[in-house]
Amino acid sequence: MGDRVILHSDINSCYASIELLHHPELRGKPVAVGGDPEARHGIVLTADYVAKKHGVKTGMALWQARQVCPDITFVPPRMDLYLRFSKMAHEIYGEYTDLQEPYGIDESWLDVTASASIKGDGYKIAHEISNRMKSELGITVSVGVSFNKIFAKLGSDYKKPDAITTMYKDEFQTKAWNLPASDLLYVGRSTDSKLRKMGIHTIGDIARADEKWLNSYLGKMGSILWAFANGYDTSPVRKENTSAPVKSIGNSTTTPRDLENDEDVKIVLYVLAESVAARLRENGFRCRTVEISIRDNELYSYTKQTKVTNATNITKEIADAGFRLFKQSYNWQKPIRSVGIRGADLVNDNYWEQLDLFHNAELKDKMMKMDAAVDDIRRRFGFYSIQRGLMLGDTILSAVNAKEEHTVHPHGYF
């Protein structure tokens, strides 16, 4: 049996590239996608290559980005727009294989083994996909071509932007083994620090090390990294039918004043939940888990999560689940400075599940219709054109920027 043909496609500077399509006047200038630069905790979500050359990095505070690149332009994130582009990219990928596994909004593994005999080898398919992404979507991708997922991802990271890199069996030692160990999937800062203390600096060092010795220091991750470095990854590209291309959609905000009671928190949770639920609906997702994050005015923070009975994208169900979590977990010894809520463990709208015995279908249908009506009004007249009655209790809190810190997170590898 021949080797598999696996591609890993990575949209270059995804958010920034999409924004530049809508802001052509910013091409050739340093641009970063992030929150309001006046906000207390805005960060860079992604930067274009001009900004990166000036030292701007993902995760950098906006004020830090301004320090290293005074001429930078900040563009607020529009996750619904990026998700639409992600769906269009997957439609292109789907013409080459139904075995595609998203890794966040901007990355995907594709198993094109079956179609390689018809459409040509992996490199040819990668080249065709790359050209179509440019001509049809106006964005570039870096594509890795290999016999497994790990080296395909290394290939897409090897050269950016707009590049195709092969990592075949007869060449991965030459191309991959000289790369830093931190380039290997799942070698984060902590693991990289441990490896350095062991005298391991490159992927080749991991490959040549004794597996049992790695295990003695890193536990089972030692064997996993050793197998990855030696090309022994046999994990399949998982066909995604009901899972969403991202694992969560969330929203958080640092409030304009400290929160001092349950009602304050409820108002903010509802504002944030409305944004999260609306984006779930816009992109055809439902969540099976609701998570909240709380930070007090002395910067102590925690997160709590709960499973919902049935997957949902209904605003009230998400907000109520979050508020129940909060009341169960917070003792009000200190005022609250920041609140977040996230819909996690996402599935597509076509996800089927058995309803529980006490499920009220009529009430759920009524809430869905109400959300749809609210969505329509807000599309036409703006987010704040219609609000819930509880938000009238504090117009300052109910006016927090519902889209300020909207975030999405990719699925893990395992």
Regions found by a protein language model. Name each.
Residues 103-107, 146-149, 285-289, 334-338:
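Short Gly/Ser/Thr- and Asp/Glu-enriched loop/turn motifs at secondary-structure junctions
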Residues 1-227, 240, 278, 364-414:
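Gly/Gly-Pro- and Ser/Thr-rich, intrinsically disordered tail segments characteristic of DNA damage-repair
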Residues 8, 183, 191-335:
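DNA-contacting surface of Y-family translesion DNA polymerases
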Residues 323-380:
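C-terminal hydrophobic structural anchor segments
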Residues 108-114, 303-306, 353-359:
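Short, hydrophobic beta-strand segments
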